[in-house]
């Protein structure tokens, strides 16, 4: 009897020790990183910047697994349902995780706060508010005054209903008390073309695709939509410092793991991300792609995701934004 009890006790201890032992040995094989974007696209290139550094820090190869489609939902679902063993990581932007939950009529096949373990905010890509040179406003304060004097007369373009730069415009309207008409396009390039051509008056857009237009004077940038000025446009003030305190509308890339991934693994990946992102040569590469490198702690990124969820919930509710 005593012998049997001893055997069962040892078996129980072995079972309890298995996850800890696995985490201790991790990683002993390549790590899959799911990306919800097409291979070769700018977001894909930006996300992959951290791969060499992470491989060096962790001692294993990182293998990209591009699962584009559904606005990022396909990749997010695969990541959420993967084994929480540290061999599947997920790099995401806000669309699938903090925006779509508030726009979809049907429930998503995952819960952002329940099914993912935030690891680190890798980078943010601030939007800029750009206008056609014919718009008689040289700064954000003048634009707000113009919009209030002519309610419903100004318009702004976006890449489509419910996308990040559409909601950036809605946030601007809410925080400034202005009435600016939204015009959705099928993709940002078409909207940019119309702003350059004077057919659309303004829009929020990422910096890198419009650098040539800025230098040529075909568009004028009135403000940066992050809380800090951009290294790419250091002389352009933030919207927050231009009369709209707290205004922030950014794209971002963050690393996640499936929920219940051992904390020791989460912490090791976080340390590797932070060390990689903080390297001077890596920072220069991010800035060259129009992204500001961050490398946050687990706790900071967890709080960031919650704030982003709350922000977009409010924007969508007040604006009545819908997706196509």
Task: Identify the meaning behind each predicted range.
Residues 28-30, 175-178, 215, 238-241, ...:
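An extracytoplasmic/periplasmic, membrane-proximal ligand-sensing/linker region
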């Amino acid at each position: 009897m005593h012998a049997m009890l001893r055997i069962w006790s040892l078996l129980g201890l072995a079972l309890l020790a298995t996850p800890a032992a696995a985490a201790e040995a991790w990683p002993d094989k390549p790590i899959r990183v799911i990306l919800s974007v097409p291979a070769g696209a700018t977001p894909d290139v930006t996300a992959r910047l951290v791969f060499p550094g992470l491989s060096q820090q962790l001692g294993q190869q990182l293998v990209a697994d591009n699962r584009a489609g559904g606005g990022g939902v396909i990749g997010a679902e695969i990541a959420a349902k993967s084994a929480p063993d540290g061999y599947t990581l997920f790099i995401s932007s806000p669309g699938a995780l903090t925006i779509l939950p508030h726009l979809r009529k049907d429930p998503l096949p995952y819960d952002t706060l329940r099914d993912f373990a935030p690891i680190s905010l890798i980078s943010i890509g601030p939007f800029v508010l750009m206008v056609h040179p014919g718009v008689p406003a040289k700064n954000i304060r003048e634009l707000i005054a113009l919009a209030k004097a002519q309610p419903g007369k100004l318009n702004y373009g976006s890449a489509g209903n419910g996308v990040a730069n559409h909601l950036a415009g809605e946030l601007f309207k809410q925080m400034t008390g202005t009435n600016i008409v939204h015009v959705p396009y099928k993709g940002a390039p078409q909207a940019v073309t119309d702003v350059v051509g004077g057919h659309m008056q303004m829009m929020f857009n990422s910096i890198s695709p419009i650098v040539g237009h800025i230098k040529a004077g075909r568009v004028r940038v009135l403000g940066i939509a992050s809380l800090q000025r951009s290294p790419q446009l250091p002389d352009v003030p933030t919207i927050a410092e231009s009369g709209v305190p707290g205004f922030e509308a950014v794209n971002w890339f963050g690393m996640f793991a499936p929920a219940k991934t051992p904390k020791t693994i989460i912490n090791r990946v976080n340390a590797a991300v932070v060390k990689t992102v903080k390297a001077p040569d890596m920072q220069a590469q991010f800035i060259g792609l129009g992204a500001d490198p961050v490398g946050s702690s687990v706790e900071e990124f967890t709080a960031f995701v919650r704030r982003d969820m709350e922000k977009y919930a409010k924007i969508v509710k007040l604006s009545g934004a819908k997706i196509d």
